[in-house]
Structure formats: C-alpha cells, structure tokens
C-alpha cells in the first residue's frame, strides 16, 4: 500500500479515458480529445489528461519540422479544459537537454497566451451550460465568473492589411 502513489489508466490506446479500477486517480485520453467522465458512482474525484507533442515525435527528431501551430496547441489546451482535463505537452529535448529553437518558440507563444488568459483555464471548471448553435464552443465557471470559449473565429480586415478581405 502506497498512499502517495498516483494511479493512471495508461494502458495503451485501447483504454483511453476508461475508468476501470476503482483505485485509479487519473485517466488519460492519450492524443484523443477528452470526453466527460461519469463520476456518479465514483467514491472520489478522478482527474483526466490528454497528451500532445509539438511535432510528430515524442522524442527529439532533428529533421522533424512539422511543428503544430501555437494556435492549434492553444485550441487543444482549451478543449481539454472543457471537460476539466489537464493538457500535457511534450517537446522532445535534444541530447544536451536543450530544446530546438522552433520548439522553444512555440512554447514561448503558449506562455504568452497563458500569461494573458491563464485565469480562464486554471481554476474554472465545466459549467454544465450548453452553448447553442456552435458545437465546439463552451463555458467554464469559477464562482460567479464565466469564461466563454469560441472556436473558428475568422479575422476580417481591409484588403490592404489582410490576405483575404472581408466578404471574400
């Protein structure tokens, strides 16, 4: 018996998000978007998490330049918080422990976003209030504060400052 041990259902791709054993403390969805977990019959709170990588590999791959955009990673972070899940982001370090400049830049942008909007994702929990008409949008709640997350909001601008002018 080890009371300070955290048990996770990291059983591979077949058991993603499944509660399974009553002793579990957390379930993982691996690289699949989290879903609600039914805790009605659970004697305790069970955390959940989704894992993601900045590129196409879990570890360091010198020639892997297929980096995910910071916008996509931010959307995935927010999608995790929709269900109260944690977002684990991997950037494979090089042999000396440092990050490639491209990975460091992506993480830096996520850090900038979190500095601006972290209040909306750290403490708030799922509100249970549905947002009608937009499947991906959702509300989080922290006490009397609500945070609306809207996805797919295109930027419109004058043709002199945007690649695609409004209405095209």
Q: Where does each model-flagged region fall?
A:
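Mature catalytic domains of secreted/periplasmic carbohydrate-active enzymes
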Residues: 1-168
């Amino acid at each position: 018996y080890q009371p300070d041990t955290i048990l996770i259902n990291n059983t591979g791709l077949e058991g993603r998000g499944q509660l399974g054993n009553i002793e579990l403390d957390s379930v993982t969805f691996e690289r699949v978007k989290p879903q609600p977990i039914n805790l009605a019959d659970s004697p305790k709170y069970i955390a959940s998490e989704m894992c993601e990588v900045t590129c196409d590999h879990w570890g360091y791959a010198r020639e892997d330049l297929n980096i995910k955009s910071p916008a996509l990673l931010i959307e995935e972070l927010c999608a995790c918080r929709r269900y109260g899940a944690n977002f684990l982001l991997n950037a494979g370090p090089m042999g000396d422990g440092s990050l490639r400049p491209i990975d460091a830049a992506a993480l830096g942008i996520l850090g900038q976003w979190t500095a601006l909007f972290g209040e909306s994702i750290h403490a708030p929990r799922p509100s249970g209030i549905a947002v009608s008409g937009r499947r991906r949008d959702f509300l989080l709640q922290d006490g009397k504060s609500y945070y609306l997350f809207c996805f797919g909001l295109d930027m419109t601008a004058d043709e002199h400052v945007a690649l695609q002018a409004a209405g095209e």
